[in-house]
Amino acid sequence: MAQKPDETLLRADTFTNVPKVSRRTLTKEEREELAKQQAAETKEAEKLAKTASKGAIGRWWRRLQSGPNKISLGMAIVALGVVYGDIGTSPLYTAQTFLSGQGGIANTDREAVLGMLSLVFWSITLITTVKYVLIAMRIDNKGEGGIFALYSLIRRHGAWLAIPAMLGGAAFLADSVLTPAVSISSAVEGLKTLPPLEALFKENGNLTLMITVVIIVVLFSVQSRGTESIGRVFGSVVLVWFTFLAVVGAVNLSGDWSVLAALNPVYGVKFLFSPHNAAGIAVMGTVFLSTTGAEALYSDMGHVGRGNIYFTWPFIKVALVFNYFGQGAWILKNQNNPEYQHMEGLNPFFQMMDPNVRYVAVILSVTAGIIASQALITGAFTMVSEATGLNWMPHLQVRYPARTRGQLYIPVINWVLCLSLIHISEPT
């Protein structure tokens, strides 16, 4: 009589390559956690399948959510505060700098306004949309972006590549000093446009500087305590800020849609080399103010996700374009207005609003300036830490004020930046 084969030799899991896990080795808590994970995966799969059944758009959305460019509404809002705070404050001072370089609003004709708008639009398009969004963000180091992440990918090709990487890091640290000073001071200058405070600021010429310095000192003083709790609302505030930019710009643009002719790049090229351009080629320095902070789209890619930047950038660009073109329409409308022809430091951003709306604009602009500064300060801490890891900087004391090690605080860098900001803010 044939011997009955051992049943364990015939079990399916005895001749498969799939690793076996004995349930007897799992604790009750581990089994519950595993069940929760399986339930979450099943729920997500059902959600994607339901979305895919809605047609071509649904199938595209399913592929997107299953890939590396996954979009999350929560992280998209976080991206607004982390990535776009810097570029979002550029409308505060770009048009003001342009008018100053041209000798005032009385010397700024239609050709100059359309030329400037054209240069701004195409600079944002080529530098931010094409260079960073379409090209640079495809070159990542395991999902991370930034100058040092890019250097890590190419360092094996030559030691000399450390030089451009160092220059890029130095440029970012310089931006961490210049941009907060300009953003905060430009926002504080909005107080001058409020009727109840006009006389006060005329009597006290240094009042803007004093308020700016107080904000800077307070901002750097709280760094040692961490900004984790404040950071949660940054994205929502920046969302309100960009919506405000778009609405105010659209209101003024509706009065003169002809400025949309500046979408033609010919206007920008003609103005750049035109004798009407009082600033000459130096006007490009003003133009590039509109792209300040564009590098954050690439450097913060690892923090917020590539897909969330792809998702939010169209809204950001539309809001910026509406605001810049709205300021251009206001300049053309008030070119011959004697009230503005001799006004010192004329800022179209605040002047194009109703006086009652300016109160909201000042509050939002100061808040946006602080958020932009916070993003740059945090980025400076991270960059110095990375440079220290590459032995490019001396080892400095690093603290972790948050519950996680994701947020850094470097005391020496903090106060060097603070003093540098105060020095930059001083009038020349």
Regions found by a protein language model. Name each.
Residues I135-I139, I215-G235, V287-R306, S425:
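Membrane-water interface regions at transmembrane-helix termini and the short interhelical loops
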Residues V82-P91, G146, L167-V188, T286, ...:
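Membrane-helix boundary/coupling elements in multi-pass transport proteins
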Residues K131-I135, H157-V182, K192-R225, V248-V251, ...:
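Helix-loop-helix module between adjacent transmembrane segments
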Residues Y132-H157, S185-P195, S229, V233, ...:
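Flexible loop linkers connecting adjacent transmembrane helices
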Residues V240-V266, N277-I281, S290-A294, V318-N336:
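Hydrophobic alpha-helical segments and their helix-loop junctions in multi-pass secondary transporters
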Residues I422-T428:
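Residue-level detector of conserved catalytic or cofactor/ligand-binding positions
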Residues K70-A79, V113-L114, V130, A159-A171, ...:
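Select transmembrane alpha-helical segments in multipass membrane proteins
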